[in-house]
Curated annotation (Swiss-Prot):
Key word Membrane present: no
Residues binding S-adenosyl-L-methionine: G164, E165, S196, S219, L220, H221, N295
Additional note from the record: Reaction proceeds by a ping-pong mechanism involving intermediate methylation of a conserved cysteine residue.
Amino-acid positions noted as binding [4Fe-4S] cluster in the UniProt annotation, renumbered to this chain: C117, C121, C124
Cofactor annotation: [4Fe-4S] cluster
Family per record: Belongs to the radical SAM superfamily. RlmN family.
Gene name of this polypeptide: rlmN
Listed name of the protein: Probable dual-specificity RNA methyltransferase RlmN
Keywords (A to Z) from UniProt: 4Fe-4S, Cytoplasm, Disulfide bond, Iron, Iron-sulfur, Metal-binding, Methyltransferase, rRNA processing, S-adenosyl-L-methionine, Transferase, tRNA processing
PROSITE patterns named among the record's database cross-references: RADICAL_SAM
Catalytic activity: adenosine(2503) in 23S rRNA + 2 reduced [2Fe-2S]-[ferredoxin] + 2 S-adenosyl-L-methionine = 2-methyladenosine(2503) in 23S rRNA + 5'-deoxyadenosine + L-methionine + 2 oxidized [2Fe-2S]-[ferredoxin] + S-adenosyl-L-homocysteine; adenosine(37) in tRNA + 2 reduced [2Fe-2S]-[ferredoxin] + 2 S-adenosyl-L-methionine = 2-methyladenosine(37) in tRNA + 5'-deoxyadenosine + L-methionine + 2 oxidized [2Fe-2S]-[ferredoxin] + S-adenosyl-L-homocysteine
Molecular function GO labels: 4 iron, 4 sulfur cluster binding; metal ion binding; rRNA (adenine(2503)-C2-)-methyltransferase activity; rRNA binding; tRNA (adenine(37)-C2)-methyltransferase activity; tRNA binding
Organism, scientific name: Lachnoclostridium phytofermentans (strain ATCC 700394 / DSM 18823 / ISDg)
GO cellular component: cytoplasm
Length: 356
């Protein structure tokens, strides 16, 4: 039950929800369309910027609603490829990171779905501090909005592959998809949105029923349960065959080809035997494998595969008629891999606090 003093998160309201909410406070329904456009098209950060509303209405909105925005904390631009890494501060002081990647086909942003992550994948910097909390729908939206504001360029593609497991924040993530792709908002095509999961089977199946046209990317990283469990604790909860069945179900329901993400770790999952086993596992599936040279993490004793091993792995998959690419590295000179910048910032902050 909402307390008397708690304000409503206006940015997390759909247009229909906003209409209903405004009616409760005695405002006309047509105002909802105006306000929604200010929030989700013009991307304003303050009610005072809504200049076609009366001063009285703006004051009323400020008293009834909370306008949640993320704030630019640090920003780094790659000298290699123009990739921009953003560190955003949330209203409670937590920080999240996002990446803007510029391609010839448009601008793509990688956003976070949680502050930290509880999945514990051994090769990922995001999990080192555990999970702090879920991001609100409004915060996920404003990650995209803030990047578009700061860059001055339209965002056309979104990958939800930053910090966090989206399926562990399912309701907020699903509402984010509906709102970011709404024709009343930024209207980003669902076909240009990709969500990554480590394999939470019930939520994957639920996502297949949502009627979305987004791409599902599975963080696979090993060709069998035994090896997968060594680097991904989630494998102890969901058997690989059940995860793959959920991927097949997603393809059946949506017609969208599933992408399998495979981070190559030297001496762990990059052998020819692993490549052959992976080929057998995915044989006959309409899918794509994305090979990722793992980013070294000083807290883990994992190293990226050699260039020869990466190419050999790819060749074996291709010989077995598996669609495969090696992910292009972007922003490697600015710690653009998931979790690296946030961790560097929090480590630095902790050192400063200790030295006070």
């Amino acid at each position: 039950m909402q307390s008397i003093t708690e304000k409503i998160d206006i940015k997390a309201l759909t247009l229909e929800e906003l209409k209903a909410s405004l009616k409760i406070i005695g405002e006309k329904e047509f105002r909802a369309k105006q306000i929604y456009e200010w929030l989700h098209v013009k991307l304003v950060r303050d009610f005072e910027e809504m200049t076609n509303l009366s001063k009285e209405l703006r004051a009323k909105l400020a008293s009834e609603y909370e306008l949640i925005c993320v704030n630019d904390l640090e920003r780094y631009e790659s000298k290699m490829d123009g990739t921009v890494k953003y560190l955003f501060r949330l209203s409670d002081g937590n920080v999240v990171e996002c990446v803007l990647m510029k391609y010839h086909h448009g601008n793509s942003v990688c956003i976070s779905s949680q502050v930290g992550c509880r999945m514990g994948c051994r090769f990922c910097a995001s999990t080192l501090g555990g999970l702090t909390r879920n991001l609100k729908t409004s915060e996920m939206l404003d990650e995209v909005y803030q990047i578009q504001r700061l860059s001055g360029e339209r965002v056309s593609n979104i990958v939800i592959m930053g910090t966090g497991e989206p399926m562990d924040n399912y309701d907020n993530f699903v509402k984010f998809i509906r709102m970011i792709s709404s024709s009343d908002g930024l209207n980003i095509s669902q076909r240009n949105i990709t969500v990554s999961t480590c394999g939470i089977v019930p939520k994957m199946r639920a996502l297949a029923e949502e009627g979305f046209a987004i791409t599902l990317a599975l963080s696979l990283h090993a060709p069998n349960d035994e090896e997968r469990a060594k680097i991904m604790p989630v494998a102890n909860s969901y058997q690989l065959q059940d995860v793959l069945n959920a991927c097949d179900y997603y393809y059946e329901k949506t017609g969208r080809r599933v992408s399998y993400e495979y981070s190559l770790v030297d001496g762990v999952n990059d052998t020819a035997a692993c490549a052959k086993e992976l080929s057998r596992l995915l044989k006959g599936k309409n899918c794509h494998v994305n090979l990722i040279p793992v980013n070294p993490i000083k807290e883990r004793d994992y190293k990226r595969s050699t260039g020869n091993n990466i190419q050999n792995f790819k060749n074996i998959l291709e010989k077995n008629r598996i669609n495969v690419t090696i992910r292009r590295e972007m922003g490697s000179d600015i710690n653009a891999a998931c979790g690296q910048l946030r961790k560097s910032y929090t480590d630095k902050t902790m050192v400063q606090e200790v030295n006070l």
